[in-house]
From Swiss-Prot:
UniProt pathway: Amino-acid biosynthesis; L-methionine biosynthesis via salvage pathway; S-methyl-5-thio-alpha-D-ribose 1-phosphate from S-methyl-5'-thioadenosine (phosphorylase route): step 1/1
Example of a GO biological process term: L-methionine salvage from methylthioadenosine
Annotated PANTHER family: S-METHYL-5'-THIOADENOSINE PHOSPHORYLASE (PTHR42679:SF2)
Protein name, as recorded: S-methyl-5'-thioadenosine phosphorylase
Subunit: Homotrimer.
Origin organism lineage: Eukaryota, Metazoa, Chordata, Craniata, Vertebrata
Xref: InterPro entries: MTAP, Nucleoside_phosphorylase_d, Nucleoside_phosphorylase_sf
Organism of this sequence: Xenopus tropicalis
Amino acid sequence: MAGVCAVKVGIIGGSGLDDPDILEGRLEKYVDTPFGKPSDALVLGKIKNVDCVLLASRHGRQHTIAPTNVNYRANIWALKSEGCTHILVTTACGSLREEIQPGDIVIVDQFIDRTTKREQTFYDGGPSCLPGVCHIPMAEPFCAKTREVLIDIAKRLGIKCHSKGAMITIEGPRFSSKAESQMFRLWGADVINMTTVPEVILAKEAGICYASIAMATDYDCWKEHEEAVSVDRVLKTLKENANKATSILLTAIPQIAAMDWTELLQSMKSTVQLSVMLPKH
């Protein structure tokens, strides 16, 4: 159909959710950006005849990049440069709610930022940055239309899925203290991780539809009589449940590609343009 925007889906894998075999006709592409190199090579290919670009792990192929040191700007810029209209990400997270059990999926709709050391904008006045200052609206950080697709697919597949949740992103790489975990619950956070911020913010600045499939692996450390979060426990739960996130991705991508996103993408582009304050000459 003339005038309909062609969909290309970027995929960012999280801890334990980084299988490049989901793509057909894979081609590795090493790229550079004005902000440096992304976490790993991009893998170009198709999922059910839909063009996709996979960044298999934001932490690097051997999980050598701490959450603080992930080059989020390069990752998002690289996917934008490849023409991605959407970014679907997977992330491990801790649950801050009794009802979100380990192994459950959460389609996140909000975030709380507790990071302290990360570049959060493409417009910060540096030599590689875009001109001006971008005051991007963040009332609805995640793409509602994309989230609806993911929620619908999860229900159809019979996967236990929470249709919303506020993700609090901490700096890491350490896990929370018990006092912090209890405080985050009082703040209204539902799940906790180390990577959603600034990824979701940068995607918004790039005018890309961004949605996150979060998998709860543990109860962090707030819950009495429950084993506190540990690397071993996170990886064990991921190994047992990673197929849930993969199934949602593989089923959702062709449905996303069949929809018309022209109006929404144009609206997002206009929002970015209206959010940038340029210097007066």
